[in-house]
Amino acid sequence: MIHRNTFINAPLHLDDTLRLRRRPDLRLAGQITGVEGYVESAATGLIAARCLVAEEVGGVAFPPPPETALGGLVRHLTSSSSDTFQPSNITWGLMAPLPATASFRGRRERRQRHAELAVELARRWGETLPGHWV
């Protein structure tokens, strides 16, 4: 059996709410967007659905902050070079770095601080939709 990973060139075709640029009435999620992994595929579904709900209730659709795992994944899908785009799962490298003013000792402390910031930013992102639907 041969495994074939089929995906679109997401930076070329998707906006940051996972809509097709040429068909904004359609959103994509899952492996076809260029994510790898079950969690990542489900996460893109959550993001696409949340953005759709935000628009339907009269709000503004926007992706999670790039300092979060979900936001970093969206940023990878929509801001990578379309010439070299390849699927990815969530890694620390996808997330926007901590502010330059942040001080910490070592990788463990840096990741702990990043995780704390990401949780807070994700909470705030979730609260931007009426009913706090995350």
Where are these regions (language model features)?
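Internal hydrophobic alpha-helix adjacent to the cofactor/substrate pocket in enzyme cavities
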Residues: 41-64
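Non-catalytic terminal regions with compositionally biased, polar/charged low complexity
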Residues: 60-67, 126-131
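C-terminal auxiliary extensions adjacent to catalytic cores
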Residues: 88-134
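Generic hydrophobic secondary-structure packing signal
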Residues: 37, 41-44, 114, 118
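Predominant activation on well-ordered alpha-helical scaffold segments within soluble catalytic domains
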Residues: 43-50, 74, 119-123
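A glycine-rich dinucleotide-binding beta-alpha-beta segment and adjacent secondary-structure elements
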Residues: 1-35, 42-43, 62-79, 85-91, ...
